[in-house]
Amino acid sequence: MNIESIIPSGNGGINGEGRTLKNICEKPVPEHLIKKLDEERLAPEVVSRMKADLARMGSSRVPEPAQNGHVDFSAIAWPGVSARLPEKDGLIAAIRQNYPGISLDDITPRSIRDITYYIGRKALADKYGITIAKAGHIIGLLDLVIHETDDSRIEIVPNNVHRFKQLYAHKGYVSKMLKLINGKEVADEDE
């Protein structure tokens, strides 16, 4: 089967529209979701900039299936929204700000994602001059998700592709950091 014609499904109800991978990658955020930005309490110029950037989002190239836990979603990421993630010591310090007294053994994927998702929302907020809470809302509104790359960056990518584990189960930053911090492993980034 041609990868482009696969219709992602399952995994928490992704892709209710029944779009093919090729269609999702060419237009990651469908027009009916982009129109929802008009209903948000945002300055018109912010909505206009977001729509212009979302119009540039996407690629005719469908990401290759995960290989050895690695995926490359960069071609379908929100243009211009990226941030570096902290190295091990910086991550531990940030987690301990959220969870004072936490032992290294008690650090989990969730406590790591609390930091990475904040960084991702902040990157979007900074780009458009909106609040971090509003940035998080918009990511969900547009059916996108924060993806941590295995080279320690965040990207905002289509949920329909990111959660399509049959092709894209991956281990990235969260898995790498968890193993460095306490030796634990996760089977997939979303666990």
Model-inferred region functions:
Residues N2-V145, T149-E191:
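Nuclease and nuclease-like effector domains acting on nucleic acids or nucleotide cofactors
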